[in-house]
């Protein structure tokens, strides 16, 4: 944000209203992993605040709002305010989550019962050695932005949407929804690994039984209202935006071997609902409410790979294509 940006401008009010989101984009996760690494969960277990982040986030947002107010009150003190707020943020996170280990002794037993020992290792070394082979950092994010002014096969990005200074920007390749489906199905069938995605999880959802389908409820008949917005209009008029990230873990194909019937989804809402936390999504619901998937770059045809080297069309911070980070 440029110095002198009015506190009541649309940009500042948007950033302040979402000063610290609890979600995020694939690129954001990769930025964190590349800078800080990862540790096995057994060595840095869950806390009450990691399982329920609400109160912790309230305090972090309050800290950031206070810091911004102090910057506006005394512009000459911006650097010192940033330093103090950064230290305070680290302190709050440590109180709620604990201090991540700077190094650890890595020992494990594999699926065949064989014991292994790798000695002392840092989180960054662990990420590079044991996760780097999956090449997750080379994945690209595909989106289905249905608005006609945003051409398919072109890159788009969101201004001010980032989480690590100097990290990779959050950018997407805009593609047809069917191409996203084809990529997801190919990964599930050929590699058998989960596929990260972002969707508008609220419409036509049976949370208790774990189902998404476009014809799940007949609200129009109940209320006598024709809810006739298509996907483009829902995005344009703020009726829909991606708001939750999950993972595709399975696909159900019809007997013809071609038609996709439904998708199996691993959610993060606990195992007391749905099928022990797993949901079923109809293929038509994917069409209407799935907006983003992360896939290996190698799956893209030559013209799409070439498009990744072109500059992105930047959209404003409040654009719905940036909503998943809320």
Model-derived features with residue positions:
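Papain-like cysteine protease catalytic cores
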Residues: 1-108, 112
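Residues that flank catalytic or metal-binding motifs in active/ligand-binding sites
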Residues: 29, 193, 242-244, 261, ...
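Structural recognition of the beta-strand scaffold that forms the well-ordered cores
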Residues: 29-31, 40-42, 195-198, 247, ...
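Solvent-exposed loop/turn segments at secondary-structure junctions
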Residues: 40, 201-204, 254, 271
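Extended, H/D-rich, highly charged conserved domains that either
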Residues: 82-186
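Long, positively charged binding patches that form subdomain-scale interaction surfaces
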Residues: 168-243
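Conserved catalytic-core surface of thiol
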Residues: 249, 254, 258-326
């Amino acid at each position: 944000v440029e110095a002198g940006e009015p506190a009541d401008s649309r940009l500042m009010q948007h950033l302040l209203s979402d000063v610290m989101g609890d979600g995020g984009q694939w690129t954001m996760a990769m930025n964190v992993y590349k800078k800080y690494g990862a540790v096995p969960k057994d060595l840095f277990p869950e806390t009450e605040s990691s399982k329920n982040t609400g109160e912790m986030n309230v305090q972090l947002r309050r800290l950031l709002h206070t810091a911004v107010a102090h910057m506006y009150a005394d512009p000459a003190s911006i650097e010192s305010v940033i330093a103090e707020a950064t230290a305070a943020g680290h302190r709050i996170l440590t109180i709620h989550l604990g201090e991540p280990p700077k190094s650890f002794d890595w020992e494990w037993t594999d699926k065949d019962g064989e014991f292994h020992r790798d000695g002392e290792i840092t989180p960054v070394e662990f990420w590079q050695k044991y996760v780097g082979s999956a090449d997750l950092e080379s994945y690209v994010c595909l989106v289905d932005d249905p608005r006609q002014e945003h051409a398919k096969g072109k890159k788009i990005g969101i201004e001010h949407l980032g989480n690590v200074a100097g990290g990779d920007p959050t950018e997407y390749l805009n593609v047809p929804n069917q191409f996203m489906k084809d990529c997801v199905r190919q990964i599930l069938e050929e590699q058998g690994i989960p596929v990260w995605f972002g969707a508008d999880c609220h419409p036509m959802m049976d949370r208790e039984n774990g189902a998404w389908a476009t014809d799940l409820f007949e609200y129009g008949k109940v209320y006598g209202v024709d809810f006739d917005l298509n996907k483009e209009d829902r995005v344009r008029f703020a009726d829909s935006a991606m708001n939750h990230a999950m993972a595709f873990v399975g696909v159900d194909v019809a007997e013809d071997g071609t038609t996709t019937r439904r998708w199996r989804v691993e959610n993060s809402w606990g195992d007391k609902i749905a099928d022990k936390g797993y949901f079923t999504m109809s293929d038509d619901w994917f069409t209407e409410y799935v907006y983003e998937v992360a896939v290996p770059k190698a799956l893209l045809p030559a013209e799409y790979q070439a498009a990744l080297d072109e500059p992105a069309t930047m959209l404003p911070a409040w654009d719905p294509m940036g909503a998943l980070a809320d």
